[in-house]
């Protein structure tokens, strides 16, 4: 069995930010520079995170419905793992 050359760190030492708030909303584009994206639903996600010094920052991004479904599925998997710890 090969040894990893990377140092092994516990989960707490890898945490760089803390999730403070998570909001999402469903939207539909009605006008755009790119007509191909009109009338397609999207999910807007707004995150509030605190870095290791406590400074809070807002982050936002948009995802298609399939991207959001995958994002949600991954969060469910994370939650299931956390429950076993």
Swiss-Prot record:
Write the record's keywords in alphabetical order, separated by commas.
Acetylation, Cytoplasm, Nucleus, Transcription, Transcription regulation, Ubl conjugation pathway
Originating species:
Bos taurus
Query: One MF term in GO for this entry?
Result: NF-kappaB binding
Write out the function statement from the record. Scaffold protein in the commander complex that is essential for endosomal recycling of transmembrane cargos; the commander complex is composed of the CCC subcomplex and the retriever subcomplex. May modulate activity of cullin-RING E3 ubiquitin ligase (CRL) complexes. Down-regulates activation of NF-kappa-B. Inhibits TNF-induced NFKB1 activation.
The protein in question is named COMM domain-containing protein 6
GO aspect biological process, one term: signal transduction
The places in or outside the cell where this protein is found are: Nucleus; Cytoplasm
Signal peptide range equals: none
Domain COMM per the UniProt entry, residue ranges: 18-85
């Amino acid at each position: 069995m090969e040894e990893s050359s990377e140092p092994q760190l516990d989960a707490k030492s890898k945490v760089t930010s803390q999730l403070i708030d998570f909001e999402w909303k469903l939207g539909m584009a009605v006008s755009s520079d790119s007509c191909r994206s009109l009338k397609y639903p999207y999910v807007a996600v707004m995150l509030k995170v605190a870095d290791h010094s406590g400074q809070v920052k807002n982050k936002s991004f948009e995802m298609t419905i399939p991207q959001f479904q995958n994002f949600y599925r991954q969060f469910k998997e994370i939650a299931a793992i956390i429950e076993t710890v």
